[in-house]
């Protein structure tokens, strides 16, 4: 039987992040992006899980502009990053990353600021409905 000290460093890092995510959530309202936070908090009440997506061409234009890249380099960067994210998420959660069909928040239509506002408004609305016990 293996012990914590025998674990590969990437597993130790994942467990430390997992614990940190729970500690942050225990301290009060927060926004956590990535790091399998939905998985870490799956047994918590009052959690909102959002997968923000946009069509690839919109993402390419945004990343090309932000990092002053050609569209081809931006697309390559996005695809490599997505592959790493999917591999990490799928490995540690035994779920499939980017199941966007479960969500309906598209930053390609709302933009970054609009998406952030939509999430904030959703949480406020949901809290008001919960408080009213409808």
Model-derived regions: residue spans:
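Conserved phosphate-donor/acceptor-positioning beta-strand/loop module used by diverse small-molecule
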Residues: 43-65, 71-79
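ATP-dependent small-molecule kinase phosphotransfer cores
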Residues: 1-29
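RNA pseudouridine synthases
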Residues: 24, 40-43
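Short, polar loop motifs at secondary-structure junctions
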Residues: 34-38
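Small-molecule kinase domains that catalyze NTP-dependent phosphoryl transfer to phosphate-bearing small molecules
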Residues: 1, 70-113
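Short, amphipathic alpha-helical "lid/cap" segments that border enzyme active or binding sites
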Residues: 18, 112-120
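C-terminal helical "lid" subdomain and adjoining coupling/linker elements of P-loop NTPases
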Residues: 126-134
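Glycine-rich phosphate-binding loops of nucleotide-dependent enzymes
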Residues: 71, 120, 125
